[in-house]
From Swiss-Prot:
Lineage: Eukaryota, Viridiplantae, Streptophyta, Embryophyta, Tracheophyta
Entry EC no(s): 3.1.4.-
Cofactors required: Fe(2+); Zn(2+); Mn(2+)
Protein's organism: Arabidopsis thaliana (Mouse-ear cress)
Purpose of the protein: Cleaves the 2'-5' phosphodiester linkage at the branch point of lariat intron pre-mRNAs after splicing and converts them into linear molecules that are subsequently degraded. It thereby facilitates ribonucleotide turnover. It may also participate in retrovirus replication via an RNA lariat intermediate in cDNA synthesis. Plays en essential role during embryogenesis.
EC class of the enzyme, as a word: hydrolase
Protein's name according to its UniProt entry: Lariat debranching enzyme
Membrane-crossing residue ranges in chain numbering: none
Activity modulation: Active in presence of diverse metals including Fe(2+), Zn(2+), Mn(2+). Binds two metal cations in two adjacent alpha and beta metal-binding pockets.
Length: 418
């Protein structure tokens, strides 16, 4: 099986697909699957951009809306995770995973699927210690704080992934596992990105939860993005001989190293995305403790999943493990017509409803972030006695902002020298 790996998509689907098709023509081959490591930007219309953590002057519709509307269809099956520049309102609709457009599958905030017999897991978002122990309290419309915190990784989702026992072939994360630079050419990386040096030397560059998952899951491959550079490493796990090949890739821009093709052993095709039995059993077991408020949540003890797994297996066999079909929940962007503001903030996605019905679980995604009860009042209008944070207190966790500052400094030095 030939798999294309892409770093940060930033909504530029057209160019990524064209690049892959060019590769196929040159090498007279067929790529079976595209994996994207976050910052996918599944923006369906103008209103979605209000949930995108990008400075307003840089917000663009890009090309995903064409695939959402059906004007275009992804030429290659595509699986993606979320990063820190996403239409977070749409990804919340698909918290458990699902088709974001025809032939384009979102793994969820955490998730595992099979493509053929290749098992692929992933964790969306980036690590921020402040919100790691919180529940998923954010709801659209987001404010200056929640538009950032909504994509911060939560312990709940990590603990679900930590329950996995069956081997994974591939794992995707947006930010890198902390310490991964010890296993590759860190000196070359620091020459390329000198402002990473302090974090590399202090071993704070990257995600602590991702490092825990790397140690536990030991996938054959681990792919990341976020830091906008290509970096390879190989992690030897103990004495059992298992090795994880790590690769981070850049964003989709001319001259950037944003794409890599790998070949992985697999059964012969045709291939399709399928639900993973073990993962859905874990999802079913953990849903009763799904944390939906700010307060600290300890989710480390959820018990065995065996009984849940047997129940899930019977249900999945009835539908041959196939995910539910893609369904649009809001109008797609139309260059000649404005989207109406009457679109609900949190539409109930039919895929999510169908999956929860299959698993015998309640729908909780429109619950109040304060009480955990369902409400039609937007979270931003709900009363709360919890502290609010000034924007200056919020740490910079966006690599784009860091790069912009460094490029500005470089420009200043150039002007000074001129």
């Amino acid at each position: 099986m030939k798999i294309a790996i892409e770093g940060c998509m930033h909504g530029d689907l057209d160019n990524v697909y064209k690049t892959i098709q060019h590769y196929e023509q040159i090498h007279n081959t067929k790529v079976d699957l595209l994996l994207c490591c976050g910052d996918f930007q599944a923006v369906r219309n103008e209103k979605d951009m209000d949930s995108l953590n990008v400075p307003r002057k840089y917000r663009e519709m890009k090309s995903f809306w064409k695939y959402y509307s059906g004007q275009e269809v992804a030429p290659i099956p595509t699986i993606f995770i979320g990063g820190n520049h996403e239409a977070s309102n749409y990804l919340w609709e698909l918290y458990y995973g699902g088709w974001a457009a025809t032939n384009i599958y979102f793994l969820g905030f955490a998730g595992v699927v099979k493509f053929g017999n290749v098992r692929i897991g992933g964790l969306s978002g980036i690590y921020n210690e402040r919100h790691y122990r919180s529940g998923h309290f954010e709801r659209p419309p987001y404010n200056e704080s929640t538009i950032r915190s909504v994509y911060h990784v939560r312990d709940y989702d990590v603990q679900k992934l930590m329950q996995l026992e069956e081997p994974l072939d591939i794992f995707l994360s947006h930010d890198w596992p902390v310490g991964i630079t010890d296993y590759g050419d860190s000196e070359s990386l620091m020459r390329q990105k000198p402002y990473f040096r302090q974090e590399i030397e202090e071993k704070t560059l990257g995600s602590k939860p991702a490092a825990l998952l790397l140690e536990k899951l030991k996938p054959q491959y681990w792919f990341s993005a976020h830091l906008h550079c290509k970096f390879a490493a190989a992690v030897q796990h103990g004495n059992d001989g298992s090795v994880t090949k790590f690769l981070a890739l850049d964003k989709c821009l001319p001259g950037k190293k944003f794409l890599q093709i790998i070949e992985i052993e697999s059964e012969p095709g045709p291939f399709e995305v399928l639900y993973d039995e073990e993962w859905l059993a874990i999802t079913r077991k953990f849903n009763s403790i799904f944390p939906l408020t700010r307060r600290y949540t300890n989710v480390s003890t959820a018990g065995t999943i065996q009984e849940s797994r047997e129940w899930v297996r019977k249900k999945l066999e009835e539908r041959q493990f196939k995910p539910f079909e893609f369904a649009r929940t809001v109008p797609a962007y139309n260059p000649s017509q404005r989207v109406f503001d009457s679109i609900p903030e949190i539409p109930q996605n039919p895929q999510t409803l169908s999956l929860l019905e299959l698993l015998g679980l309640p729908y909780l995604l429109d619950s109040s972030p304060v009480t955990g009860e369902r409400t039609d009042i937007p979270a931003s209008l709900a009363p709360s006695d919890l502290p609010t944070y000034d924007s200056e207190e919020i740490p910079i966790d966006d690599i784009d902002e860091i790069e912009e500052m460094e490029e500005a400094k470089a420009d200043d030095h150039t002007r000074d020298d001129a």
